[in-house]
């Protein structure tokens, strides 16, 4: 069988199996539910060794499904990671990067002019071909100007915000972030959607949970396949939880937020079972990047044994918690050692729907179904970018660093530290250190904390270098970067007057447009 035909046959058999249908029946593709947390660390779940064991629902999800201990973000920051998930492509390809060398690669503050390019195929757009109804609940973060609205990029419904819940702002120098229902805003954070920074109380996770439950019920009643992208703000700083969860964790306010997330995931999975659609619903839980150690201990989580955190390309910034759950399809209680990427959720979702990925562009995401359903492992590299620079690559158990850098000495002296308590001489550098000729190579199985680079003179080092070098050369030779979306800033494009503001009396007057190159910190 030719490769294309084989792939088509695989998808067809999968869909028929998932629906419990033979060739005579009309296939019903499985529902797809992607649960994307914000800044949650690999070490925040009991199943990954968090000692207080405060995530019983997520731990049970893993026991009933499959755990991926080697699952990676496509970038150590929010927006590029989300763009990669929804396009199946590295941020350097889809435009979610900046050409300011080694910059933190953009958290898309309100003044960012760019967003998801029209020419990118976004997952819900493609799922429409298979009859899916799609909803995003929570943070979009792929551009807040009208042309970047999620309903213009394939989603049928949206409840959430275009940016993170930073604030409160005075609505003069900077507006508070709007919350949308579909096309129009229904309020703003810290106004109609209060967040008490002193106590940490906010009801947002409960609001987002109810949106998810209502959507699932409606689609089940209508007998329509659905794609739900539940991308809530928790556990991003400023960390919040609703009143019933505040003060319940041994881990402080951050732990309270994790417990509320765990409870919410439990309710979502229980609803799928109560509606008797769990065996026809694929669920995947992960995070957009590593825990923000800079915000720890009360506002940041744990990256387990890994080095550093969010904003770095060490393992703590890029390796994520990941659980796949599909009762009756994915064998329960399994662990997959497949190197996985958040970009794989794009390709895997298309495969679940019986669709092939676009053939007119490079797709970096891998179809994980062979790993999940058949235990097949695929050898593949994981590329770590920061800005427009390839910082590192993992191949098998080995990781090669071509550049190392955490944050600047200036920031470090101000108390800003992305690797608190984890100084590794020659590795966690505060200047941009190049290793392209002799990369620092670590064996992540023996040394997950990236503390002991292989000796340059060792046979092991030379063997790994021979394996890694052609992979990197081929990647760089064939790479065609997308148009950078995160270079230009303009205060006039902030959320001054979103659609629907006039109905609420919430329109604000924007300042004069003064576009300029964004000043990305180093």
Swiss-Prot record:
* GO cellular component term, pick one: lysosome
Catalytic machinery residues = 78 (nucleophile), 141
The free-text cofactor remark is: Binds 1 Ca(2+) ion per subunit.
- Tell me the enzyme class: hydrolase
The UniProt catalytic activity note for this protein reads: Hydrolysis of the 6-sulfate groups of the N-acetyl-D-galactosamine 6-sulfate units of chondroitin sulfate and of the D-galactose 6-sulfate units of keratan sulfate
List S-S links within the chain. 308-419, 489-518, 501-507
The principal location of this protein is other
User: For this protein, what post-translational modification is recorded in UniProt?
Assistant: The conversion to 3-oxoalanine (also known as C-formylglycine, FGly), of a serine or cysteine residue in prokaryotes and of a cysteine residue in eukaryotes, is critical for catalytic activity.
3-oxoalanine (Cys) PTM positions? 78
Residues with attached carbohydrate: 203, 423
For this protein, what is any one GO molecular function term? arylsulfatase activity
- EC nos: 3.1.6.4
| Catalytic domain: annotated span | 27-379
Keywords, comma-separated and alphabetical: Calcium, Disulfide bond, Glycoprotein, Hydrolase, Lysosome, Metal-binding, Signal
User: Where is the secretion signal located?
Assistant: 1-25
Q: Give cofactor(s), names only.
A: Ca(2+)
Give the residues the record marks as binding Ca(2+): 38-39, 78, 288-289
CDD domains, per database record: GALNS (cd16157)
Q: Which Gene3D superfamilies match?
A: 3.30.1120.10, Alkaline Phosphatase, subunit A
Q: Please state which protein family the record places this protein in.
A: Belongs to the sulfatase family.
Q: What is this protein called?
A: N-acetylgalactosamine-6-sulfatase
Q: Which species expresses this protein natively?
A: Canis lupus familiaris (Dog)
């Amino acid at each position: 069988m030719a490769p294309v035909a084989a792939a088509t046959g695989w998808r067809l058999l999968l869909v028929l199996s998932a629906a419990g249908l033979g060739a005579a029946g009309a296939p019903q593709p499985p529902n797809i539910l992607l649960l994307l947390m914000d800044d949650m660390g690999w070490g925040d779940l009991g199943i990954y060794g968090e000692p207080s064991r405060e995530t019983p629902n997520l731990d049970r999800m893993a026991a009933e499904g499959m755990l991926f201990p080697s699952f990676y973000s496509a970038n150590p920051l929010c927006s590029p990671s989300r763009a990669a998930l929804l396009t199946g492509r590295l941020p350097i390809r889809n435009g979610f990067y900046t050409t300011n060398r080694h910059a933190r690669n953009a958290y898309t503050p309100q003044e960012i002019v760019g967003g998801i390019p029209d020419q990118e195929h976004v997952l819900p757009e493609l799922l429409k071909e298979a009859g899916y109804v799609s909803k995003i609940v929570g943070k979009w973060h792929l551009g807040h100007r009208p042309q970047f609205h999620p309903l213009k990029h394939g989603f049928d419904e949206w409840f959430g915000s275009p940016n993170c819940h930073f604030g409160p702002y005075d609505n003069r120098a900077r507006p508070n972030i709007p919350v949308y229902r579909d096309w129009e805003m229904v309020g703003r954070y810290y106004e109609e959607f209060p967040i008490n920074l002193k106590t940490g109380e906010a009801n947002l996770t409960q609001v987002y949970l109810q949106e998810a439950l209502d959507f699932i019920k409606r689609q089940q009643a209508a007998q329509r396949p659905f794609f739900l992208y539940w991308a809530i703000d928790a556990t991003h700083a400023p960390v919040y939880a609703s009143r019933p969860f505040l003060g319940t964790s041994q881990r402080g306010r951050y732990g309270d937020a994790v417990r509320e997330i765990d409870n919410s995931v439990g309710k979502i999975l229980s609803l799928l079972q109560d509606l008797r659609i769990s065996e026809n619903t694929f669920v995947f839980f992960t995070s957009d990047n590593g825990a923000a150690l800079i915000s720890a201990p009360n506002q940041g989580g744990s990256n387990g044994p890994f080095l550093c955190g969010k904003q770095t390309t060490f393992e703590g910034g890029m390796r994520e918690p990941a659980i796949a759950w599909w009762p009756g399809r994915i064998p329960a209680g399994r662990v997959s050692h497949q190197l996985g990427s958040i970009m794989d959720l794009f390709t895997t979702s298309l495969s679940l729907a019986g669709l092939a990925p676009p053939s007119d562009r490079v797709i970096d995401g891998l179809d994980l179904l062979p790993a999940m359903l058949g235990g097949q492992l695929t050898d593949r590299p994981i590329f770590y970018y920061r800005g427009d620079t390839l910082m590192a690559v993992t191949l098998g158990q080995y990781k090669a660093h071509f550049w190392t850098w955490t944050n600047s000495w200036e920031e470090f002296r101000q108390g800003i530290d992305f690797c608190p308590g984890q100084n590794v001489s020659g590795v966690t550098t505060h200047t941009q250190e190049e290793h392209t000729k002799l990369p620092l190579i670590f064996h992540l199985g023996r040394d997950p904390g990236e503390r002991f680079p292989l000796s340059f003179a060792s046979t092991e080092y030379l063997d790994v270098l021979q394996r890694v070098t052609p992979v990197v050369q081929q990647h760089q030779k064939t790479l065609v970067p997308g148009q950078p979306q995160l270079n230009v800033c303009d205060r006039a494009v902030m959320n001054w007057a979103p659609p629907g503001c006039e109905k609420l009396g919430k329109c604000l007057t924007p300042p004069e447009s003064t576009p300029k190159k964004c000043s990305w910190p180093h």
